């Protein structure tokens, strides 16, 4: 399941992030890539040793924590390995899949990947995020403050930036529910449950559906 979150970040949060990134130290993105991804990764990233990194990462994580769509659809156990990336003229990230395990010896699983767009699409040419499916591919170039969340199992790429500057935050989620089809089923049931409550309050049908959602969580949560 791929889903977008418009306005994940407020205008004030966006301004805070972009203002600080403009003054921060960026390093070669290959330093955080797997051995095969290094061959196709050409971007820059905010150094994790930079004095602003922890604050910006915390701001982004809080935005995800407060967002109900992200919480219900992703069922996050932990959001990890956050990176702030910059692409300028000629930079790209070729076709790749994300590492299954991240965080060094912590062995954090990547179930879901996310990209948060930090500047408007008019600020750069090219630079689309392209996600492949079995028989097609879809390009995304979204408004500043918007997030897209997609399975880490996919092949995807960032097309070359031909002018301007592309700023994004990327990260990964280890979900409480490992199986993608189970997460989607829980999301659909939760959507129906909330719709029933909005229409009729705490009815017998709402209670029965709530029981089923809770019992599925008991079976599937790790």
Task: Please place each PLM-identified region on the residue numbering.
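Non-heme Fe(II)/2-oxoglutarate
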Residues: 1-76, 81-83, 185-222
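Catalytic core of non-heme Fe(II) oxygenases with the double-stranded beta-helix
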Residues: 68-181, 186-187
